[in-house]
């Protein structure tokens, strides 16, 4: 690969069409660059398939590289369905890790990159930790979860859900592959354990969990106010008949967003 081509690759981001020989050379160039600069790089691929293929090839040839892939929503712009909760969970984890510079290379299909992404400030504002022995007001905790986009349900089964039963809170954090059961003693977190969604039985103890926002947009009071203002500017007519306007005004997301 010519020197001029290598310099072009080391710009902040570039388009890439995958094949194995290119993957080997590009990985070598990136590895050398990252060792010296210690700054993550963005690669934009033509489609999701190229992103997945490139990730697999780079991991095979350069296992020491930390590679992040931001998944696509896998929905069309005007679909009346929302992305699958597990997919949203993967995206939010990837976005959070990008804000923390946890990876050497970020892979983004161009279809994914063309969508609006939440700013770093949003991810940081709505992410928080909980740990054993921490004092927490349960009602305030419930309010915060709802403002973060989590659904209050009877039984936790999917990412983005939580349930409260007396002094026990079950929650499936976005970005986590397992749900957690938080047991309180008064206002103090006594224990935190993972649990099985099928049997609902507790499994393994842990000392700390990370909670990411449940959505890529805010539905707290400030977010709802901004939505209402912008909606009134863009659309005319009787807003009382607008389902999106009414639902978001109540802080309730609807299918398709």
Predicted regions mapped to residue ranges:
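ASCE RecA-like P-loop NTPase motor cores
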Residues: 1-257
């Amino acid at each position: 690969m010519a020197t001029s081509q290598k310099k072009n690759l080391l710009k902040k981001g570039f388009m890439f069409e995958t094949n194995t020989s290119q993957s080997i050379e590009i990985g070598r160039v990136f590895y050398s660059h990252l060792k010296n600069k210690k700054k993550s790089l963005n690669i934009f691929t033509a489609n999701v398939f190229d992103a997945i293929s490139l990730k697999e090839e780079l991991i095979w040839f350069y296992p020491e590289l930390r590679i992040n892939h931001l998944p696509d929503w896998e929905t069309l712009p005007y679909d009346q369905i929302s992305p699958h909760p597990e997919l949203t969970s993967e995206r939010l984890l990837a976005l959070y890790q990008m804000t923390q510079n946890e990876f050497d290379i970020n892979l983004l299909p161009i279809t994914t990159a063309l969508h609006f992404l939440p700013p770093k400030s949003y991810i940081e504002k709505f992410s928080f930790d909980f740990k054993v022995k921490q004092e927490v007001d349960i009602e305030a905790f419930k309010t915060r979860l709802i403002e973060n986009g989590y659904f209050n349900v009877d039984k936790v089964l999917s990412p983005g859900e939580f349930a409260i039963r007396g002094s026990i809170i079950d929650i499936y954090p976005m970005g986590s592959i397992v749900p957690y059961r938080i047991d309180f003693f008064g206002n103090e977190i006594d224990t935190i354990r993972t649990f099985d969604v099928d049997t609902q039985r507790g499994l393994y103890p842990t000392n700390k969990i990370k909670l990411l926002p449940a959505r890529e947009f805010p539905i707290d009071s400030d977010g709802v106010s901004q939505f209402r203002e912008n909606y009134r500017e863009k659309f005319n007519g009787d807003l009382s008949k607008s389902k999106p306007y009414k639902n978001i005004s109540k802080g309730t997301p609807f299918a398709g967003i």
